[in-house]
Amino acid sequence: MIKIENWSTEDIEKYSRLIGEAFAASPGIAETIPHDDLVKSFEIITEFYYRMGTLYTTSEKYEGFLAYWDKNTRQPLGPALHMIRRMLREIPLLNIATGSSEQYKKLYRKEKDYIAVSMVVVLQAYQGQGFMKKVLELPFAEAAKRGCPCILDTDNIQKVVKYEHCGMTKTAEKKMAHDITLYTMAYLPTSA
């Protein structure tokens, strides 16, 4: 895995759009938000993670991406405000509210540490080739090194199965609006 640094504005636009398109093609919350709004929201979120310094990719071919951080990572104010301004300016408020929730923070708040993972995605051209496991290697290794869980939320039951195949277990599920279920997944290294 490679930490993404020194992207041009064009790179950010290109890959954030591809990430948004990959999420838009998945079931779950994606089915309840207009396609263009969903793609735009992932463009904004990708830029946020890039500015935050938490965006990683599988290789220089950019097959898959994720953002991860530990429990004590503080979000820099500048990138967070930039993201909020863009969301409010570019996406209808109702669609922002529909897609936002972090169940894992509530469930794992008593843990001394954890590795939080977000935006796990394999671009459409590379799906079905085993890249999901490769995308998760780095945060799993970090969790094992620290002896803490690696956690994430997903609204996609198909991804639950894929995450389980990669070594995660489902630790919670919560019914949300629009018949969506939010699943919390955890990788628990043997030393955690």
Give, region by region, the residue ranges found by the protein language model.
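A short beta-loop-alpha structural element at the N-terminal edge
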Residues: 2-17, 28
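Helix-loop element at the rim of GNAT/NAT acetyltransferase active sites that forms part
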Residues: 16-36
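Active-site rim helix/loop that mediates acceptor-substrate recognition in acyltransferases
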Residues: 34-55
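Conserved acyl-donor/pantetheine-binding loop and adjacent beta-alpha core of acyl/acetyltransferases
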Residues: 62-120
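Conserved GNAT acetyl-CoA-binding A-motif
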Residues: 113-116, 142-155
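Conserved beta-strand-loop-alpha-helix junction that forms the acyl-donor binding cleft
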Residues: 118-127, 151-161, 177-179, 188-189
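Conserved acetyl-CoA-binding loop-helix of GNAT-fold acetyltransferases
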Residues: 122, 128-141
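Conserved active-site alpha-helix within GNAT-family acetyltransferase domains
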Residues: 133, 145-147, 156-173, 177
